[in-house]
Amino acid sequence: MNDPFARMETRGPQGAANPMDSSRSLGDLGPFPREVGRGAPLAPGARNPATAGASRSQGGGHEDRTADRALGPRAGEELDRESWVREKVLFLLHPERWLGTRGDPAREEVAGAEDLPHAGGEDHGEEPNYPSVFQRQKRISGRRVAPPRDAADPPKYVLVRVEDYQVTQEVLQTSWAKGRMTTRTEEHFVTALTFRSSREGQPGERWGPAESRALQARTGASRVHAAGRRVSPSPGTWLEEIKL
């Protein structure tokens, strides 16, 4: 009677669960509820919104790539070259703007917060002189734009000469592993930019090579506003007319 193994043997068959009975009892409870967060089944002709969004995003990227391919690399190179010429001339004419020198009110902007609100009540209308937490700072804006020119002054132009050429040089290279000296050729592409101020001219006129040489002999340029391509006297060399 007190044998634990006997109690286990007598209670085991009664307490054991029949797998057929458990499945039958689960079947009586009905079907399981649908998982939370999963929507209703899609109709036979309906599209899955997740796949539709993915295809739409892929289609937009394809259209962007097609538009970039239509522009071509040449258009991007032209824009980069013209902007580079414009920025270079600005630096040569007004280095103080690029170096951050103060003194030009048209180029400086005030950045920072104003003084904090003053507390009142005991000063009888007088505002206490509290120091500002955020000190005012002056900075030079990133975009270099010439100050507005007086309408009475006639427009002036400066002629910029841009020349692309290739430099080839031989470099002696020593190979320590094999104990011999070899020659290696290096090629460098150089862009030379020179500019001279020109006489007062009319915008849109074309100059010949003789006139361009005469214009390059003058000096005294001031501000730069815009650039436009004019004459290409030789391959790899062109002239940029800069409006002052």
From Swiss-Prot:
Q: Where is this region: Disordered?
A: 1-79, 100-130, 219-244
InterPro entries cross-referenced by the UniProt entry: C6orf141 (IPR037739)
* Protein name stated in the entry: Uncharacterized protein C6orf141
UniProt organism field: Homo sapiens (Human)
Top-level taxon of origin: Eukaryota
- List the biased-composition ranges (Basic and acidic residues): 1-10, 100-127
